[in-house]
């Protein structure tokens, strides 16, 4: 948090949110693909 005054909080929150969505998306996509291939 050394650049707390220079980096807008909304930008940090947006990047963090996109990262979480990307990880969850890949996780659910992998689970869905694995489930589909196993059936």
UniProtKB/Swiss-Prot annotation:
Self-association and partners: PSII is composed of 1 copy each of membrane proteins PsbA, PsbB, PsbC, PsbD, PsbE, PsbF, PsbH, PsbI, PsbJ, PsbK, PsbL, PsbM, PsbT, PsbX, PsbY, PsbZ, Psb30/Ycf12, peripheral proteins PsbO, CyanoQ (PsbQ), PsbU, PsbV and a large number of cofactors. It forms dimeric complexes.
Topology in membrane: Single-pass membrane protein
Functional note: One of the components of the core complex of photosystem II (PSII). PSII is a light-driven water:plastoquinone oxidoreductase that uses light energy to abstract electrons from H(2)O, generating O(2) and a proton gradient subsequently used for ATP formation. It consists of a core antenna complex that captures photons, and an electron transfer chain that converts photonic excitation into a charge separation.
InterPro entries: PSII_PsbJ, PSII_PsbJ_sf
Protein name in UniProt: Photosystem II reaction center protein J
Organism listed in the record: Microcystis aeruginosa (strain NIES-843 / IAM M-2473)
NCBIfam families according to UniProt: PRK02565.1
Cellular component aspect of the GO annotation: photosystem II reaction center; plasma membrane-derived thylakoid membrane
Key words, A-Z: Membrane, Photosynthesis, Photosystem II, Reaction center, Thylakoid, Transmembrane, Transmembrane helix
Transmembrane segments: 7-27
Family of the protein in this entry: Belongs to the PsbJ family.
Subcellular location: Cellular thylakoid membrane
PANTHER family: PHOTOSYSTEM II REACTION CENTER PROTEIN J
Listed SUPFAM superfamilies: Photosystem II reaction center protein J, PsbJ
GO biological process: photosynthesis
Main subcellular location: membrane
């Amino acid at each position: 948090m050394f650049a707390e005054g220079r980096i807008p909080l909304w930008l940090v929150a947006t990047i963090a949110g996109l990262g979480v969505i990307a990880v969850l998306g890949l996780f659910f996509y992998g689970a869905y693909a694995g489930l589909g291939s196993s059936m």
